[in-house]
A protein has these predicted regions:
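Active-site-proximal helices and loops of the catalytic beta/alpha 8
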Residues: 54, 218, 272, 278-314
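Structural beta-strand segments of beta-rich domains
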Residues: 24-28
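Catalytic domains of carbohydrate-active enzymes, especially glycoside hydrolases
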Residues: 168-186
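Conserved, mostly hydrophobic/aromatic
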Residues: 30, 144, 183, 223, ...
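Aromatic- and acidic-residue-enriched carbohydrate-binding clefts of CAZyme catalytic domains
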Residues: 155-162, 193-249, 260-280
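Short proline/glycine-enriched turn/loop motifs at strand-loop junctions of beta-rich domains
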Residues: 31-37
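The feature marks proteins involved in alpha-glucan
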Residues: 1-23, 53, 60-145, 150-157, ...
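Hydrophobic faces of well-ordered beta-strands that scaffold small-molecule active sites
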Residues: 140-142, 181-183, 254-256, 285, ...
Length: 314
């Protein structure tokens, strides 16, 4: 492992959680419980072991946020995790989760196998994409589970149970008169193995669920990352964008169902919805759980024309 002192770092911006390219470098920020210690772990791509572990200093902490920046960082060459009090902690604001490509796979003994990737932000031709203008009272909504809907469908010729497979269903939905698709949780969540324990409200814990798989995803999730095991390709960003573009070309809107338990940071909830709207062109959200900050969302300028559905929605 490379010595920490050989990696030049600067004080980061705590306002932006996760890993984000900012002003010539990469900013890493993570929320931790009061009194906890944290560090950043970097991996070279295709390397099983950590490349370097960089402890956060007290100077890089404000409140319960740690933040540091690495100048001239090349994210395409690395992957990362955080460590909190000596335990690997997957960034809840990561744009990509690696190591969970197979749905329902048992947790690996290697604690460094599951790790975070960076937003590629590669050029994508939206072909003048426009969201379908469908009033609430005219919505004919079809709710589905990305994996379950096409996994046993004999008419699907591509990789079943994926975003790509849903593209093949568009003519069928058009025939039915469907104009809105609602996706059950399609962001990353740990359906088996070690996960964050929402019931105990711990930042980092190990809750073993051997032999059990949470098929539906109504648990704390990684709200910025399309679920990797729902992808036919190794590029979740492009695959999900392509699905949205083709839905819109057919005049079909896409609403994402998202579950936020009560311990969710309300600003992370807001930022997650803004991200899916701006980056993926999602048309709306069906929000579940006790952590939905309805007043904040309803008054947000970016989401002002976005379809928002939640408990007591009127």
């Amino acid at each position: 492992m490379v010595e920490r002192r050989k990696i030049r770092t600067e004080k980061g911006l705590a306002l932006v959680p996760g890993a984000n390219k900012l002003s010539g470098g990469c900013n890493f920020a993570v929320e931790v419980p009061e009194g906890s210690q944290a560090s950043l772990v970097l991996y070279k791509k295709r390397s099983r072991k950590p490349f370097v572990e960089i402890p956060f200093t007290q100077e890089e902490r404000i409140g319960n946020m740690y933040a540091l920046s690495i100048p001239d960082f090349q994210p395409e060459a690395y992957e990362y995790n955080f460590m909190v009090d000596g335990k690997v902690y997957i960034d809840p604001c990561a744009y990509r989760i690696l190591g969970r490509e197979k749905f329902g796979a048992a947790v690996d003994a290697d604690i460094h196998k599951v790790r975070c990737g960076f937003l590629r932000n590669e050029a994508f031709d939206w072909e003048g994409d426009k969201e379908p203008s469908i009033p609430y009272h005219e919505m004919i909504l079809y709710k589905l589970h990305v994996r379950g809907y096409t996994k046993t469908n004999r008419t699907v010729t591509g990789t079943k149970g994926t975003f790509q497979a849903l593209e093949e269903m568009i003519p069928y939905w058009k025939e039915l008169g469907i104009n809105t698709i609602e996706l059950m949780p399609a962001y990353e969540f740990m359906e088996s193995g070690t996960c964050r324990d929402a019931e105990k409200e711990e930042m980092v814990s190990e809750k073993r669920t051997e032999g059990r798989v949470n098929f539906w995803g109504y648990i704390p999730g990684y709200y910025f990352a399309p679920k990797r095991s729902y992808c036919a390709t190794d590029d979740p960003e492009k695959e999900f964008k392509t699905l949205i573009k083709k839905l819109h070309q057919a005049g079909i809107a896409c609403i994402m169902e998202m579950y936020f338990p009560k311990e969710c940071n309300m600003l992370v909830v807001l930022r997650a919805l803004q991200f899916w709207k701006l980056y993926y062109h999602v048309d709306g959200f069906h929000l579940l759980g006790e952590g939905v900050p309805t007043e904040i969302l309803m008054h947000d300028a970016i989401l002002s024309n976005t379809r928002l559905m939640f408990h007591d929605f009127n």
